[in-house]
Design a protein with these regions (language model features):
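Beta-solenoid repeat scaffold
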Residues: 2-41, 48-59, 80-85
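Glycine- and acidic/polar-rich repeat regions and solenoidal domains
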Residues: 17-18, 44-49, 63-85, 93-289
Length: 289
C-alpha cells in the first residue's frame, strides 16, 4: 500500500527470484530496504524485478551469483513496467555466469521517470552491457530517467562488441527522444569495449562524470541533440584511453576536461566521424550543427 516500508533482515538469500510490484504515490512511496545496508546478500541464481509506481529498493548486495534468466535487475515484471521507481544504495559485484559468452546485463531500465543512484556496479566479466536504457516500447520513450552518483568499477577488455558499460537505445531508436540524464558518476577502468557509454538515441545529457583510465570513449553513436558537458576524462597515459566520439547532428559538447589520454583512431580524445553518403541510421550520419 502507499507509504508502506518493508525491511529485509540481515542474511544470505540464495536462488531468489524477487518480484516486487506496487502502487505508491509521489507523497507516499513504497520502500523496500535492507535493515542494514550491505548485509542483505543476494546470491546464487537470483534476479530482481521492480514494477508499478513509486517503488524504492535500497541496500541490497548481489554477490557470488548469476542471473539464470534475463538480467540481474529489470525495471519491469512481465509486461508491467516501472514508473517513478528507484534503485539506490545497492551493489552488484561479480555477478557473472560460468561462461563469458553468456550475455546479460546488470540493470535494464524500462518505463519512465526511474532512477538508479548511489549504486556500485563492478566486476562484470561476461558479454552484455552493464546498464541499458530500453526504448523498444512506446511506454519507454521520453523517459527522463536519472542515472547518477553511481560507481562503475573495473571491467576488463572483453574482445568484441556488446561489452559497453552503458547504452541508451539502439540504432532503431536513433531519432527517438530518450531524455535520459547521466550525471555525477565515476567510471573507473571500464574497458569492456571501445564504447564505454554508447548513446543511440536523441536528447540525452551526459554531464559531470569522471572517466578514469577507461579504454574507450563516450560515443554519440546514433541520434541527435545530445549534450556532453563538464565531464573529466583522465587517461594517465594508458593505452586506448579516449574521450568523445561524435556522429549525427545537433549535439552540444562543451566544458569537458581531457587529460593524459593516449588513444588513437576510434579511441581518440575527440573523434568527429566521416559520414557515409545517404547513410542509414545504423551507419554514420553526417556531423552537422
Amino acid at each position: 500500500q502507499p507509504g508502506d516500508q518493508i525491511y529485509i533482515k540481515d542474511g544470505q538469500y540464495k536462488d531468489m527470484q524477487l518480484k516486487w510490484t506496487g502502487k505508491g504515490t509521489e507523497k507516499a512511496s513504497i520502500k523496500i530496504e535492507a535493515l542494514n545496508p550491505g548485509k542483505v546478500k543476494i546470491e546464487g541464481g537470483s534476479t530482481l524485478r521492480i514494477a508499478g509506481e513509486w517503488m524504492s529498493v535500497s541496500g541490497l548486495h548481489f554477490t557470488d551469483g548469476y542471473a539464470p534468466k534475463g538480467s540481474v535487475v529489470e525495471f519491469r515484471n512481465g509486461q508491467e513496467l516501472a514508473n517513478h521507481c528507484r534503485l539506490t544504495n545497492c551493489v552488484i559485484d561479480g555477478f557473472n555466469p560460468s561462461r563469458r559468452d553468456q550475455a546479460y546485463s546488470y540493470i535494464l531500465l524500462y518505463g519512465r521517470h526511474n532512477r538508479v543512484d548511489h549504486c556500485s556496479l563492478t566486476g562484470k566479466l561476461n558479454l552484455g552491457v552493464t546498464l541499458i536504457v530500453i526504448l523498444n516500447d512506446e511506454r519507454c520513450l521520453e523517459n527522463h530517467h536519472q542515472i547518477d552518483h553511481n560507481y562503475f568499477g573495473e571491467r576488463p577488455v572483453y574482445g568484441s562488441n556488446g561489452a559497453e558499460t552503458m547504452r541508451v537505445g539502439t540504432s532503431q531508436q536513433a531519432y527517438s527522444s530518450s531524455n535520459t540524464v547521466i550525471e555525477n558518476n565515476l567510471f573507473e577502468r571500464c574497458s569492456g569495449e571501445v564504447e564505454v557509454i554508447s548513446i543511440k538515441s536523441s536528447d540525452n545529457v551526459i554531464r559531470n562524470n569522471i572517466l578514469l583510465e577507461c579504454e574507450g570513449v563516450v560515443a554519440l553513436r546514433h541520434g541527435d541533440r545530445n549534450t556532453v558537458n563538464n565531464n573529466l576524462f583522465i587517461g594517465n597515459g594508458l593505452r586506448n584511453t579516449g574521450g568523445i566520439r561524435v556522429v549525427n547532428a545537433g549535439h552540444q559538447i562543451y566544458d569537458n576536461t581531457l587529460v593524459g589520454l593516449a588513444g588513437t583512431r576510434f579511441f581518440s580524445a575527440l573523434g568527429v566521424m566521416d559520414a557515409v553518403p545517404n547513410s542509414l541510421p545504423n551507419r554514420y550520419c553526417q556531423v552537422v550543427d
